[in-house]
Amino acid sequence: MKKTLITLATALVLSGCGSSPKEDDNTFTVGMEAAYQPFNWQTSKKTDTAVKLDGGAGYADGYDVVVASRIAKKLGKKLVVKKIAWDGLQPAVESGEIDAIIAGMTADKKREKGLDFTTPYYQSEMVMIVRKNSTMTSFNDIQQFSGYKVTGQKNTNYDTIIDQIKGVKHQTPKSTYPELVVALQQGDTDGITAELPVANGIVQANPDLAIVKFADGHNFNVDTAVSIGLKNNTRKTAEFKNIQKALDSISQEERLKIMEDAVKRAPTDK
């Protein structure tokens, strides 16, 4: 990483310009996993909402893709979507490979040390996904999962919050939600943490699973708002301000409708 940043800095000096080459580009390049429905997923179907994956097979679709498309249109630029593993998203912004992370990412304190975030573009709630035939479907307090095996996604808040459950059997996290679902269905874990829209999509595709919602005051203590991640120390730039302005032009009502539609068209095949 240090080598990458030094190389980038050298390139900027040699170019004789203090700004990123991206600023003069006519594209808005975003990164996402394309494996986190209904926020984002990969598909072979070309639709009105899907965008061709850059350098990859098929298309990207989902809530994040529609939001990114709206922003790109407002910026007067062509949207380019790159499929990047979760752990590679921040380095991709830092190196200039992408302009922004639009991938259901929460702006926590650790990430804010290396990224600048816009205001939230979606607010959700935390739930647990369990097997439909289990007694856990009646739970309404996270502490009822004490003694049970619970798993979350690797390198996310949704893994670290599991330790808020006293006596929980915190399992090794998985890299993607498809992996988590398989672990749950095979009995390797009893519950997986997820945001409600993600859980809705998973249960829609897997009728053998169910969602556990928690009562007020008995849920995880976690920020479930997701924001757009941009390169660090760019908050005062025209690029950041233009992206924020474009995001602000999407009303809360429109955002809810975009998510509702994304959940409906998310893949239901396992």
Segment roles from a protein language model:
Residues 15-16:
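C-terminal motif of bacterial Sec signal peptides marking the signal peptidase cleavage site
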Residues 23-104, 113:
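Extracytoplasmic small-molecule ligand-binding "clamshell" domains
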Residues 34-35, 123-130, 204-247, 267-270:
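Periplasmic-binding protein-like
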Residues 37, 57-74, 105, 127-181, ...:
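Bilobed "Venus flytrap"/periplasmic-binding protein-like clamshell domains
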Residues 65-74, 148, 156, 223-268:
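Extended ligand-binding regions for polar small-molecule ligands
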Residues 73, 78-144, 218-221:
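Acidic, polar ligand-binding/catalytic clefts
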Residues 76-78, 94-103, 148-149, 185-198, ...:
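Alpha-to-beta junction loops
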Residues 88, 104-114, 161-164, 190-222:
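A ligand-binding cleft/hinge motif common to bilobed small-molecule-binding domains
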